Structure formats: structure tokens, C-alpha cells
């Protein structure tokens, strides 16, 4: 009977050994999905991209866990639902996590909670900006050809915290402490970048600085691509002036109250026509 049980093909080898996933019981793990996340990481190399932005102050001859491995372990922890860095103490010897980092169960343990904490406090402001730019580079690299136009959906979102995290702030609207990061997706729902910030509405100066860096990073890859911004009151007049100066298209959301000039109406109308065409075709 077990010979008829299907297997999950296509998993990459770990330390030169083949990996076979079956569904016939035996020793089970609730974190078996880490092997699939490993395949995503092998393709995208997110940990390596972020690690390349950080200057490692450690002595090279005394390093056991590379920055990329520490980041990769942390990303996998969060993806598997272990958001607390303290969980690393019990997960560093877990065979599934080891396999996801190209180690066999008998190999050394992964990094400790204290190592993760030191890494998370290592980046300064310029380093964080480089890391945000690395995510934009990853987004642009995901296209097989240069797009003629992209839509950037820009918004902020509330993220509650339950400790004494740095930058946490009480938000009266949500009646909780937390962060209020700015997040950017494209019109197809693909993540582009984000900026962690205190739980308050960003001002016009902050939005302009964020947009300026984002646009510069995108245009380093696609100088001729038309960019259409879509947002609500987050794109307040300070952001609107930047839109005009950078010759962008603006597609406000429901809470914005801008008097759109013809240069704004044209790309908005084109985008709405495109959406109607897709709806009819579907």
C-alpha cells in the first residue's frame, strides 16, 4: 500500500543527500513546509541580498554563522509562525530548520537567540535604506522584460506589538501600541518594499523622502517605464507636488481630495480603461 503513496518531487539536495517528502505517516513534523520555503529562498536569495547590505563587524576567522544564514533562519522562523526571537533557542536544533539551511540533523545547531538579537540591532539608518533598495532590486529582477507601465499601491498599515520594541508608539485610533509601516505593492499585488516606522500618520516630508528613494531605485532599472501612483490620503499635497515634478501619474484612493490636472487624468483614465477591458475579457 505504501508503494502507491505519492511523493513530492523536485526538492533540492541537502548537503549532497537527496530529499524525499512522502505522506504515509511515521515521524511527522508540523514544520515540513520549511522545505518548500527553502526552494523559494534558493530561487530568490532574499537572505543573501539583505546580508550583502550589512557590514559584518565580526572577525572572519571566528564566524560560525554567516549573516546570510542568520537572516535566513530568522526569515524561516517568522514564515513558520515563530515571530519571537526567543524561539530560536528551541528551534536551532530542529531537523527541519537545519535541513532548510542545508544541514543534516547531526550537524551543528543553528544560531542562538542572542546572535539573532545582535544582528537585528546591527543595521544603522543607511544600512536599512540599502536593504529596502535590495527588495526593489529583487522586484525589478522578477520581470522577464521591462514593463511599459507599473502601478505602485502605497499605503500604511498598523502592526500591533506586545513588548517594549524600539520605535513602538501608542495609536489612539487602534487603542494599542505598535508600528505603522509604509508598504508598497504593484498593481498586480507583488510586494516591492516597505519602511518600518512609529504608529502615526507620516508627514509630507517623510512621504516625499520615501517616494524619492523608491522612484530612484526603480528608474535605475527602468528609466523609460511610466509609473502610476495609487494611494489614499497618504499621498497628501507634499506627495502630489513630487508627483508633478517627477512627471508621474497619480491615481488617488477614496480618501484623497486632489484636483487632478490633465497630466494626472490621462494615466488614470488609461488604467481604468485597461481594468474594464480585463474585466470584460475575463
Task: Show where each model-derived region lies.
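Distinct, well-ordered alpha-helical segments
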Residues: 207, 211, 239-242
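An anionic, glycine-rich sequence signature occurring as long contiguous blocks
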Residues: 3-19, 249-282
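Dynamic "connector" segments at or just before major functional cores
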Residues: 1-202, 208-221
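Short, surface-exposed connector motifs at secondary-structure boundaries
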Residues: 220-227, 245-247
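Acidic, His- and aromatic-enriched active-site or binding-groove loops in soluble protein domains
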Residues: 174-178, 212, 245-259
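Hydrophobic "anchor" residues on beta-strands that sit immediately upstream
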Residues: 151, 228, 249
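Acidic/histidine-rich, metal-coordinating catalytic segments
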Residues: 155, 226-235
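A short acidic (Asp/Glu
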Residues: 163, 237-242, 261-265
Amino acid at each position: 500500500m505504501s508503494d502507491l503513496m505519492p511523493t513530492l518531487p523536485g526538492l533540492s539536495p541537502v548537503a549532497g543527500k537527496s530529499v524525499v517528502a512522502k505522506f504515509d505517516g511515521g515521524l511527522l513534523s508540523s514544520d515540513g513546509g520549511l522545505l518548500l520555503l527553502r526552494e523559494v529562498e534558493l530561487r530568490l536569495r532574499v537572505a543573501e541580498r539583505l546580508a550583502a547590505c550589512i557590514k559584518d563587524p565580526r572577525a572572519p576567522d571566528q564566524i560560525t554563522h554567516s549573516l546570510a544564514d542568520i537572516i535566513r533562519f530568522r526569515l524561516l522562523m517568522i514564515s513558520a509562525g515563530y515571530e519571537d526571537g526567543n524561539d530560536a533557542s528551541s528551534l536551532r536544533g530542529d531537523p527541519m530548520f537545519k535541513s532548510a539551511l542545508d544541514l543534516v540533523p547531526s550537524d551543528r545547531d543553528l544560531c542562538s537567540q542572542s546572535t539573532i538579537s545582535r544582528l537585528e540591532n546591527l543595521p544603522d539608518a543607511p544600512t536599512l535604506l540599502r536593504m529596502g533598495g535590495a527588495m526593489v532590486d529583487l522586484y525589478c529582477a522578477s520581470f522577464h522584460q521591462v514593463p511599459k507601465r507599473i502601478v505602485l499601491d502605497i499605503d500604511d498599515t498598523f502592526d500591533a506589538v506586545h513588548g517594549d520594541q524600539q520605535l513602538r508608539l501608542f495609536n489612539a485610533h487602534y487603542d494599542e501600541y505598535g508600528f505603522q509601516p509604509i508598504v508598497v505593492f504593484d498593481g498586480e499585488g507583488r510586494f516591492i518594499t516597505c519602511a518600518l516606522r512609529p504608529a502615526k500618520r507620516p508627514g509630507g516630508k517623510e512621504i516625499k523622502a520615501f517616494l524619492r528613494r523608491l522612484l530612484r531605485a526603480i528608474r535605475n532599472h527602468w528609466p523609460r517605464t511610466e509609473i502610476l501612483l495609487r494611494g489614499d490620503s497618504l499621498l497628501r499635497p507634499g506627495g502630489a507636488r513630487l508627483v508633478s515634478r517627477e512627471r508621474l501619474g497619480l491615481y488617488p484612493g477614496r480618501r484623497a481630495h486632489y484636483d487632478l490636472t490633465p497630466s494626472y487624468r490621462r494615466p488614470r483614465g488609461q488604467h481604468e480603461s485597461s481594468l474594464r477591458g480585463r474585466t470584460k475579457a475575463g
